Amino acid sequence: MSRPLLQLALDHTNLQAAQHDVALLQESVDIVEAGTILCLTEGLAAVKALRTQCPNKIIVADWKVADAGETLAQQAFGAGANWMTIICAAPLATVEKGHGVAQSCGGEIQMELFGNWTLDDARDWYRVGVRQAIYHRGRDAQASGQQWGEADLARMKALSDIGLELSITGGITPADLPLFRDINVKAFIAGRALAGAQNPTQVASEFHAQINAIWGAQYA
């Protein structure tokens, strides 16, 4: 396992506000995500603007692609994304097409685990070359009071055992990180916990301190 990264999720409804938060936090995070809401509002301009603003960061196009994997991957990676998300309900052919473009561009596909999916699905994604997935506690689940539980951790461990690296998101705070010490974590994704904090850079420092305390220098 490698040391987990810290990802800033930008689910703003306008690009100017997103770029304001990036200006505050880009030196404190490893990955900058053009979130689904931002991309639906601003289109490809969101990915292009973030690439220009953050030339040395990993940029994620969180598009949750369900079809047209090849065409949309060409758009995402052509705009400057390093990673693009595909929704878990997408046909395997869509995953394969998107992954093929990602490989040709030096990028990666992340499978977005919303709704219904199985470990057999995960094995299929791994078989066609995908190595990343995103494990969610969605906005609506958080609002209803759903917490991280043993069932979540067991599913994450099973995905890790298949060989997938997981980005974990859903109201994550630094205090939550010890729950995931046995998981193959690629990144912790925080949006409002970072951008909405009174002192965003301090919260980012707390994330990094907790990551270092749990995973340590041996994973650096």
Could you describe each region identified by the protein language model?
Residues 98, 149, 181-183, 193-220:
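C-terminal helical cap(s) of enzyme catalytic domains, especially alpha/beta-barrels
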Residues 26, 47-54, 96-106, 126, ...:
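Surface-exposed amphipathic alpha-helices with a cationic face
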Residues 27, 79, 128, 182-183:
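Structural motif
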Residues 150-183, 187-189, 193-194:
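A C-terminal functional module that forms or caps the active site or interfaces directly
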Residues 1-70, 109, 195-197, 201-206, ...:
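Conserved N-terminal beta1-alpha1 strand-loop-helix module at the mouth
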Residues 2-6, 68-163:
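Conserved anion-binding
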Residues 11-12, 61-70, 112-118, 165-175:
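Glycine-rich beta-to-alpha transition loops that act as phosphate-gripper elements at the mouths
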Residues 36, 88, 113, 137-138, ...:
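Short secondary-structure boundary segments
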